[in-house]
Amino acid sequence: MNELSDESILKYTKKISENATIDNWNDYKWQLSNSIKDVDTLENFLGITFDEKEKTEIQKAIDVFPMSITPYYASLIDIKNLGKDPIYKQSVASSKELILENFEMEDPLSEDEDSPVIGITHRYPDRVLFYINPNCAMYCRHCTRKRKVSEKSSNPSKEEIQKAIDYIKNNNKIRDVLLSGGDPLLLSDEFLDWILSEISSIKHVELIRIGSRVPVVLPQRITDNLVNVLKKYHPIWINTHYNHPVEITKESKKALDKLSDSGIPLGNQTVLLAGVNDCPYVMRKLNQKLVSSRVRPYYLYQCDLSKGISHFRTSVSKGLEIIESLIGHTTGFAVPRYVVDAPGGGGKIPVMPNYVVSWGSDRVILRNYEGIITSYVEPSDYGGCSKNCDTCDRMCIGDFEINQTGIEKLITDVDNSISLIPENNERVARRDD
């Protein structure tokens, strides 16, 4: 596990201030106040010198997409391997970000279009994304929300946050609230406590999730006081954002342990990034280190169509190759779900290798990770569903609502639909002529 010695830490702190100490280094507020935001500071901190052309190109990118790196995260950069270093690529601005493709978008997931009130994205029936803070400890170069991160105009007021909470209160189908940003854990303990208290008091909200990269880039933020705030509101889940095994350091592991020991389940959402983790063996090592740190791999995201990140995108086939190399080759719950977050707001679409080879009238032909092909004989007397939920003998506890959407209508026994037809289909329209 990566670990900085006290001597190395002092070397870095002295680059920032002659009077700085290890206690300063371990103070998240000191880390934030000394974030690296320009090329000169980066050169001084790392002890490197860019040539003038490269320095100018980096600065041009910063002028369009601001840079901010915590000293802690910058200390993980391998200065002997800058061109290939995964920490450097994720954190330092690049002229490649200025190459804009015509298919790239500021809001590729149409989060703003699915926003009924400021701060809320309501895409799925029973859950919402609650955008509570535009600020991040570090500005990831592959960020899908570059349009909002660090923008003061994107910072919701307390009144706007209250209106968003009221929206959740007034929609009793919402059972799951995801706090997002920016990074929710950069809010003050007191303000975060208030938000969590308000949401947890809503009877129909069953759980709260928090998406945060703080354990990765600013583990010092996971203080005892913050943990005491969070654990008051179980069930609360936290999804981290580790992209490479070198990010799991001693300091980061300590932060994860604090969260896990307080009873908070941890998941991880990785973005597939060209030149960073687009390798089956890097991804396997990452997920195995996560599991040993009590973090379950949750999603592997295909890189979005946001502006300025085309150099990070891989082919979808690369993602499938990685999943193929994980299934069967490592622990089952060390395999994330590979998804494409559909442009235009279609939501997360799982993409998986195909393990069904063929079907017969009474059997399914399957293959395993080794290439072994096998036959599974299906039951001959399976009766399916009576399609009458009022007389069903399945032990379904409590009230529930049948609200089928999309392919679910065609594949379940409850609905009699035989096809899904897009709106304005010309052939169907001719039937009415």
From Swiss-Prot:
What does the cofactor section's free text say about binding?
A: Binds 1 [4Fe-4S] cluster. The cluster is coordinated with 3 cysteines and an exchangeable S-adenosyl-L-methionine. Binds 1 zinc ion per subunit.
Keywords from UniProt, A to Z, are: 4Fe-4S, Iron, Iron-sulfur, Isomerase, Metal-binding, Pyridoxal phosphate, S-adenosyl-L-methionine, Zinc
Q: Which cofactor does it need?
A: [4Fe-4S] cluster; pyridoxal 5'-phosphate; Zn(2+)
Q: What happens when the gene is disrupted?
A: Cells lacking both ablA and ablB no longer produce N6-acetyl-beta-lysine and are incapable of growth at high salt concentrations.
What's the top EC group for this one?
isomerase
Annotated positions binding [4Fe-4S] cluster: C136, C140, C143
Q: Which residues bind Zn(2+)?
A: C279, C389, C392, C396
E.C. designation(s): 5.4.3.2
- Quickly give the catalysed reaction: L-lysine = (3S)-3,6-diaminohexanoate
Q: Which residues form the Radical SAM core domain?
A: 122-334
Family annotation (InterPro entries): Aldolase_TIM, LAM_C_dom, Lys_aminomutase/Glu_NH3_mut, Lysine_aminomutase, rSAM
- MF GO annotations: 4 iron, 4 sulfur cluster binding; L-lysine 2,3-aminomutase activity; metal ion binding
Where N6-(pyridoxal phosphate)lysine occurs, the residues are K348
- Which family is annotated? Belongs to the radical SAM superfamily. KamA family.
Q: What does this protein do?
A: Catalyzes the interconversion of L-alpha-lysine and L-beta-lysine. Is involved in the biosynthesis pathway of N6-acetyl-beta-lysine, a compatible solute produced by methanogenic archaea that helps cells to cope with salt stress.
Stored PANTHER family:
L-LYSINE 2,3-AMINOMUTASE (PTHR30538:SF1), LYSINE 2,3-AMINOMUTASE-RELATED (PTHR30538)
Q: What is this protein called?
A: L-lysine 2,3-aminomutase
The upper taxonomy is:
Archaea, Methanobacteriati, Methanobacteriota, Methanomada group, Methanococci
